[in-house]
From Swiss-Prot:
This is Imidazoleglycerol-phosphate dehydratase. It comes from Methylobacterium radiotolerans (strain ATCC 27329 / DSM 1819 / JCM 2831 / NBRC 15690 / NCIMB 10815 / 0-1). PROSITE patterns: IGP_DEHYDRATASE_1 (PS00954), IGP_DEHYDRATASE_2 (PS00955). One of its GO terms (biological process) is L-histidine biosynthetic process. It is an enzyme of class 4 (lyase). HAMAP family: HisB. It is found in: Cytoplasm. The keyword Aminoacyl-tRNA synthetase does not apply. Its EC number is 4.2.1.19. Keywords: Amino-acid biosynthesis, Cytoplasm, Histidine biosynthesis, Lyase.
Amino acid sequence: MRSASISRKTAETDIAVSVNLDGTGRSNIATGIGFLDHMLDLLARHALFDLDVKVDGDLHIDQHHSAEDCGIALGQAFAKALGDKRGVTRYADIHLPMDEALTRVCVDISGRPFLVFRTTFRVEKIGTFDTELVREWFQAFAMNAGLTLHVETLYGDNAHHIAESCYKGLARALRKAVAIDPREEGRVPSTKGSL
């Protein structure tokens, strides 16, 4: 089973994350940020990852540290669960519609972290959640998971729909990218022999 747990404690946050890449989409999310809980629940369900996330953060200041550190810890757990990446499909992409919004997500489990994030929001908040934290979470996750990740919203009006299309797109792309390709016969999918 490809699974891992990470605990991360700083002066700003105390986080415990567990992920099972070969799960059923079960989740138990408690970040203290309702909208982020919703997005991570979508991530688990659409990637078919089992995901447990507990964040105690300095929400009396704002949501930034909790959102970013959650992305860091989840990225670290994802990378640890993947191990040496033997047999994975590695590359995946998807166009994910959410009502009027359409987002393209492309991922390479490369071990070379990089994020291209071409998504904009017309409003500063979704409920109490700062929309700029969507990018912060994706940046933290991609850097710590070792992913080359491209997220581009082609169009959309509703900020909730745009954010949801980003997270669901990530989920569906990761679901394909981490899938074991039986033709790889346990090899690392790289001419270098490692990722």
